[in-house]
From Swiss-Prot:
PROSITE patterns: PROTEASOME_BETA_2. It catalyses: ATP-dependent cleavage of peptide bonds with broad specificity. A double ring-shaped homohexamer of HslV is capped on each side by a ring-shaped HslU homohexamer. The assembly of the HslU/HslV complex is dependent on binding of ATP. Protease subunit of a proteasome-like degradation complex believed to be a general protein degrading machinery. Keywords: Allosteric enzyme, Cytoplasm, Hydrolase, Metal-binding, Protease, Sodium, Threonine protease. The lineage of its organism: Bacteria, Bacillati, Bacillota, Bacilli, Lactobacillales. InterPro entries: ATP-dep_Prtase_HsIV_su, Ntn_hydrolases_N, Proteasome_sua/b, Proteasome_suB-type. This is ATP-dependent protease subunit HslV. GO terms for biological process: proteolysis involved in protein catabolic process. One of its GO terms (molecular function) is metal ion binding. It comes from Lactobacillus leichmannii. Its EC number is 3.4.25.2. Allosterically activated by HslU binding. The gene is hslV. It comes from the Bacteria. Belongs to the peptidase T1B family. HslV subfamily.
């Protein structure tokens, strides 16, 4: 289990995620997993929660769709979600993906949905609700922070509450064009 949080703020979109991998409900198998990656010529950043093998499959599918649609993230995400919804094998995948580029911030769910957040914040994983609430609070009341600082602190707060999230946090960001 994990927590991934992405924030779009002041011309920057950032993502933060912890590195904990849990087997079952109680065994911490790893604390430094890389759940945030750059794809499509480093123009798209993704973060995932759920089964690692499932997430890698979704990453490969999204990369293929990005290649097919010349890097158009919104179109690639919709096409990926449609494939995910129609394919019985893909429907069994248990993962969620946050994807963003210099224009869009999207959540691609296991139900084949593509959502753009209302408050410029999206969070997934076992600590996702905690991170999302923390990030929205910081966006509303904490001036002077960057998107990256907000995302990282939101995951830190989630890690304080959620036993399946650790404090080994990795961040990445893209400036809007």
């Amino acid at each position: 289990m994990t927590t991934i949080c992405s924030v779009k703020y002041n011309g920057q979109t950032a993502i933060a995620g912890d590195g904990q991998v849990t087997l079952g409900k109680s065994i911490i198998a790893k604390t430094t997993a890389k759940k945030i990656r750059r794809i499509y010529h480093d123009q798209v950043v993704i973060g995932f929660a759920g089964g690692v093998a499932d997430a890698v499959s979704l990453q490969e599918m999204l990369e293929g769709k990005l290649e097919s649609y010349s890097g158009d993230l919104r179109r690639a995400a919709v096409e990926m979600a449609q494939s995910w919804r129609k394919d019985q094998t893909l429907q069994k995948l248990e993962a969620m993906v946050i994807a963003f580029n210099d224009q869009d911030l999207l959540l691609i769910s296991g139900n084949g949905e593509v959502l753009e957040p209302d408050e410029s914040v999206v969070a997934i994983g076992s600590g996702g609700y905690y991170a999302q609430a923390a990030a929205v609070g910081m966006l509303r009341h904490a001036s002077g922070m960057t998107a990256s600082e907000i995302a990282k602190e939101a995951v830190n707060i989630a890690a304080d509450i959620d036993v399946f999230t650790d404090h080994e946090i990795v961040t990445d960001e893209i400036e809007e064009k």
